[in-house]
């Protein structure tokens, strides 16, 4: 993989691209470990929140709706004892006949197949048919599996979790069971140590200050899509995607970004733009501020809304927009 993106404050020339003067990767001692960990689960159990808690930056977009995550995002966690390459997967789900649903499930299954460790994230006290689907997928992997109960802070009576734990985590299928609140970072450090312990020995693959292998161009599109998730109605965000048409730094060090928001119908276009363009303006303003924080420099963002009918069920469109692996 190419060199990863760094934290805010890195120079513009070194972010989101291959650079020959990247800092050396951390030295690997005899006990140093490095490998991939797939964060897997049904939609909306907090996978992106957990990735962000582990990496230490808001790398994966977070939203109240299922299927916020559409791409596998590699987050990099560097510790003295090891380096974790995190795969944040789309939620595995039953049903969904459109091409994009099939592609999202395929991406999640591929992450399980290539991971050194699989982290099965569920909601504390709740086991659904889709959780069982995830477990069935994990049964095809011989890699270590960790069961993680998230949102324990929402449980009023923690004692009720004991019979639940006996039911879902006591048959030896999982190498370990953890209770966490990803939102509050409760229990996250212990989970991090356990993931590293199950990784294979090896040197780090990325520098200590790199947090993702995704380019700033990709992250910019994700931040725009996050605002679509947060600001639009229940269904429309699933018919929208973002394409970065140009991304360049000017002489003053500001990034000039032009992006297209693609929807499937003219009526959806009108909703995204809003009365007098106010909705599109709000989306752009919030996304721009998020980019300023993540990239550590000023961003000038221009947005357009375009229509491509039924793009989410069009294999050629999915490939163009980066969904096909």
Where are these regions (language model features)?
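Conserved, well-folded catalytic cores of nucleic-acid-processing
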Residues: 57, 76, 80, 111-118, ...
């Amino acid at each position: 993989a190419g060199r990863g993106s760094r934290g805010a404050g890195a120079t513009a020339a070194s972010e989101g691209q291959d650079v020959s003067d990247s800092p050396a990767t951390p030295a690997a001692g005899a006990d140093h470990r490095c490998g991939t960990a797939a964060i897997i689960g049904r939609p909306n159990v907090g996978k992106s929140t957990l990735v962000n808690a582990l990496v230490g930056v808001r790398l994966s977009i977070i939203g109240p709706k299922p299927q916020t995550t559409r791409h596998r995002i590699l987050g990099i966690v560097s510790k003295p004892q090891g380096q974790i390459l995190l795969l944040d997967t789309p939620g595995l789900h039953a049903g969904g006949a459109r091409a994009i649903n099939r592609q999202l499930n395929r991406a999640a299954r591929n992450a399980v197949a290539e991971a050194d460790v699989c982290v099965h994230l569920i909601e504390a006290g709740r086991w659904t048919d889709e959780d069982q689907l995830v477990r069935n997928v994990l049964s095809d992997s011989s890699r270590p599996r960790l069961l993680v109960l998230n949102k324990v802070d929402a449980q009023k009576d923690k004692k009720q979790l004991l019979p639940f734990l006996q039911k879902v985590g006591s048959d030896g299928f999982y190498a370990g069971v953890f209770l966490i609140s990803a939102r509050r970072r409760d229990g996250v450090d212990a989970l991090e140590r356990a993931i590293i312990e199950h990784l294979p020995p090896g040197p780090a693959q990325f520098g200590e200050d790199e947090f993702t292998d995704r380019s700033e161009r990709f992250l910019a599109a994700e931040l725009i899509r996050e605002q679509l998730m947060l600001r639009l109605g229940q269904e429309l965000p699933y018919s929208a995607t973002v394409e970065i048409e140009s991304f360049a730094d000017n002489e003053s060090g500001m990034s000039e970004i032009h992006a297209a928001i693609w929807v499937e119908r003219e009526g959806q276009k009108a909703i995204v733009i809003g009365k007098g363009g106010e909705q599109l303006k709000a989306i752009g303003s919030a996304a721009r501020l998020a980019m300023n924080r993540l990239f550590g420099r000023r961003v000038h963002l221009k947005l357009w809304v375009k229509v491509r009918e039924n793009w989410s069920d069009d294999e050629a469109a999915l490939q163009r927009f980066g969904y096909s692996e």
